[in-house]
Amino acid sequence: MQTDLSDSSLFNHKSVMTDEILVSVDQYPLISDNKLTAIDATLGGGGHSYQLLKKYPDLKIIGLDHDPFARQSAFIKLEEFKSRIEICPSNFANFEPKEKVSFVIADLGVNSNQIDNPQRGFSFQKDGPLDMRMNPLLEMNAEDLIETLNEKDLADLIFKFGDERLSRKISRRIKKDLQEKGKYSGTKDLAYSIAGCFPPKQRYRKIHPATRTFQALRIAVNKEIEALERFLELAPNWLLPGGIISIISFHSIEDRLVKNSFKGDERLKNLTKKPITPNEKEIENNKRSRSAKLRIAQLK
C-alpha cells in the first residue's frame, strides 16, 4: 500500500536542539541585517526552519530535502511563511545555491516519520517492507542490498556503518536465510533473525539487537556517508564571510566526520571544541534526542 502524500498527519517529527540552533546562528556577525538568508540543508518537517523564520522576520530560507513526504509536510507547516521559504527537492550533496548565505543548518538524523511509518521500512517495531530509502526514487532498497552483496561484503558493511561486533555471524545468518527461503517477509522477520545471532541474555536489553544492523543498512542504502563528506566539502563555499554552519549528528561516524572537517578545514574556524548535547529536559521530552551532538563552525 502506498502512503498518501497528502496526509500531513503522517509526518509528526520533533526537531531536536532547536534552542541551541537559534543560539548558534546568533553568532553570525550580521545577524541583525535585514537581508539574512539561510539554507536548511535537511528541511524534514520544517521544525528548525519554522523557529528560525519566527524569530527573524526578515530571514529567507532555502530548504532542501529529497524525501517528498518531508517536503509536503514542511510546505504545510511553513504556510504562514511561504513568501520567505523556498523548498527544493534536493539532497544537500547535490545542491549549489545561486547566492551565498548567512548560515547553514543540518540535522543528520532520521526523522520520526521515516521511523514510525512502517511502509518506509526503517523500523522493526512495526512490520514493513525492507525498503529504507529516504528518496523513493533511489534504485536500490535494503532488500536489494542484502541480496546483492556477498557474505563478506555484507559483514564488512554491518561492521563499518553499525559498529556491530557480531557482523560476520549476522551476515552469515542473513545469507543462509536468503538461500533457504528466498527473501524476508519484512522488517520484523529480518530483525528476528538478527536477534537470534545474539546470546539469550542480550536479546532483551533496552537497545534491540538489530538496531546497529538496521542503522548500517540504512546508511548504505542512502549513501549517507558519501553524501555527508560531499556536503562538508561544499557547504563552506555557500557561506558569506563570517557565516555560520551548524550540524547535528546522531552517531559516531557522522560526528567524527563533522569534527574532523571543522578542525581541519582551513576555510573554517571551529567554534565547538566539544559537541553541544541536549539538556535533560529535552531528553526527557524526546528520548530520540539523547544521542544528538551539535557542532558549529564559522567561515573565516
From Swiss-Prot:
SUPFAM superfamilies membership: Putative methyltransferase TM0872, insert domain (SSF81799), S-adenosyl-L-methionine-dependent methyltransferases (SSF53335)
Gene3D superfamilies to which the protein is assigned, alphabetical: Putative methyltransferase TM0872, insert domain, Vaccinia Virus protein VP39
Residues annotated as binding S-adenosyl-L-methionine: 46-48, 65, 92, 107, 114
InterPro entries in the cross-refs: RsmH (IPR002903), SAM-dep_MeTrfase_MraW_recog (IPR023397), SAM-dependent_MTases_sf (IPR029063)
Cross-referenced Pfam families: Methyltransf_5
GO molecular function ontology, one term from the record: rRNA (cytosine-N4-)-methyltransferase activity
Compartment annotation: Cytoplasm
BP-aspect Gene Ontology terms: rRNA base methylation
Source organism superkingdom: Bacteria
Keywords: Cytoplasm, Methyltransferase, rRNA processing, S-adenosyl-L-methionine, Transferase
Catalytic function, reaction form: cytidine(1402) in 16S rRNA + S-adenosyl-L-methionine = N(4)-methylcytidine(1402) in 16S rRNA + S-adenosyl-L-homocysteine + H(+)
This enzyme's EC code(s): 2.1.1.199
GO CC terms: cytoplasm
Family assignment from sequence similarity: Belongs to the methyltransferase superfamily. RsmH family.
NCBIfam families, alphabetized: 16S rRNA (cytosine(1402)-N(4))-methyltransferase RsmH
Role noted for this protein: Specifically methylates the N4 position of cytidine in position 1402 (C1402) of 16S rRNA.
Name assigned to this protein: Ribosomal RNA small subunit methyltransferase H
Taxonomy of the source species: Bacteria, Bacillati, Cyanobacteriota, Cyanophyceae, Synechococcales
